[in-house]
């Protein structure tokens, strides 16, 4: 993923940003509300960063694999896990755009602000389907479609997603019971001033 270097640079101060903290807590609350989480579940967070979202959910889940392709983020994550003394959170260096799929299968896969960085989102959704056990749940929190101002000039990923287009992609990948909810309203300073960007939560199941 092209943003690896910038995420490595951001990793040491990521957890100090109150917006990152607030966003993770809001999405965790939305996931709890929409998915019947269980401490018997094995879960995968893809694009976990420093682990803010999974730390907010860790008491609701069993073993959690926290996967990311940024070495800097994973270094901070490992320190966070060690400091908290949590033995059911497991870091994993993984980039599904290039790496082989893990052998493990999961009851839940979730992402936060990851999908818009992945060039081939359709393929990633298909990978998520493969990685889920039958009856498993998927939760994707990401940007609603925007005008490109969120990242600014030079960004090569997706400028958010149209909900109905993503719904169709999820159905095409094999998912069922696809629903969308607004999970967070993010305020961000841009070249055009302070802007608001809604984040959706897409929830789906593998039949």
Q: What does each model-found stretch correspond to?
A:
Residues 15-21, 137-201:
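C-terminal alpha-helical "lid/dimerization" subdomain adjacent to the S-adenosyl-L-methionine
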Residues 98-104:
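Short amphipathic alpha-helix with an adjacent loop that forms part of the alpha/beta core around
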Residues 202-207:
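C-terminal lobe and adjacent flexible extensions of AdoMet/dcAdoMet transferase-like proteins
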């Amino acid at each position: 993923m092209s943003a690896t270097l910038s995420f490595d640079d951001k990793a040491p101060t990521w957890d100090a940003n109150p917006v990152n903290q607030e966003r993770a807590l809001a999405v965790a609350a939305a996931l709890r509300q929409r998915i019947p989480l269980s401490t018997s579940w094995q879960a995968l967070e893809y694009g976990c960063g420093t682990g803010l979202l999974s730390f907010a959910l860790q008491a609701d889940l069993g073993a959690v694999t926290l996967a990311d392709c940024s070495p800097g983020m994973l270094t901070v994550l490992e320190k966070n896990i060690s400091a908290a003394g949590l033995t059911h959170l497991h870091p994993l260096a993984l980039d599904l755009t290039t790496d082989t799929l893990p052998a493990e299968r999961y009851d839940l896969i979730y992402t936060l602000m990851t999908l818009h960085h992945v060039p081939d989102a359709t393929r990633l959704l298909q990978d998520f389907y493969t990685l889920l056990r039958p009856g498993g749940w998927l939760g994707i929190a990401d940007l609603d479609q925007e005008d490109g101002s969120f990242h600014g000039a030079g960004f090569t990923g997706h400028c958010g997603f149209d909900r109905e287009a993503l719904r169709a992609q999820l159905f095409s990948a094999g998912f069922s019971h696809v629903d969308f909810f607004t999970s967070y309203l993010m305020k961000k300073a841009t070249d055009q001033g302070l802007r608001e960007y809604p984040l959706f939560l897409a929830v789906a199941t593998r039949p």
